Amino acid sequence: MSASADQIQECFSIFDKDNDGKVSVEDIGACLRSLGKSPTMADIEALKTEIGAKEFDINTLKSIYKKPNIKTPQEQQKEMLDAFKALDKEGHGTIQGAELRQLLTTLGDYLSTAEVDELFKEISVDSTTGAVSYASLVNTIVSGYPLGGF
């Protein structure tokens, strides 16, 4: 689902607190999320560098919104599920908690140990096997659990 020009303008107006036609570059992630995108922290840092100023205007937001590398939550969910399925050689739909911790703290847009500890409080880990349903994990992350920009 794409945001309309009116929705982008409305979003911009909400973040343009003093009505000067500019929004703080620190709000770029929140703007994109409110428009249905799901930028990672790495995406946000790259956008700040690309913008190269402390503020941006509506045309910059429109241009950034159109970038295909800023995924929607649905695209991000599919990408994460595909990655977990590739690791799941036996097709059980699970990953061991210890392996998950290691992956989340070392790969890609990785999380701190404290962030992983917080995540583990929100997900279900099988007390017998130590396994985590990766579909449930992905749903938790994509549904808005505030991890590293998700």
Curated annotation (Swiss-Prot):
Subunit structure comment from the entry: Myosin is a hexamer of 2 heavy chains and 4 light chains (two regulatory light chains and two essential light chains).
InterPro entries given in the database record: CALM/Myosin/TropC-like, EF-hand-dom_pair, EF_Hand_1_Ca_BS, EF_hand_dom
Keywords annotated in UniProt: Calcium, Metal-binding, Motor protein, Myosin, Repeat
Species for this entry: Dictyostelium discoideum
GO BP field: cell migration; mitotic cytokinesis; myosin filament assembly; sorocarp development
Protein name per UniProt: Myosin, essential light chain
EF-hand domain span: 3-38, 75-110
Record's GO cellular component terms: actomyosin; extracellular matrix; myosin II complex
PANTHER family: CALMODULIN LIKE 3, MYOSIN LIGHT CHAIN 1, 3
Residues that hold Ca(2+) according to the record: 16, 18, 20, 22, 27
GO molecular function: calcium ion binding; cytoskeletal motor activator activity; microfilament motor activity; myosin heavy chain binding
Organism superkingdom: Eukaryota
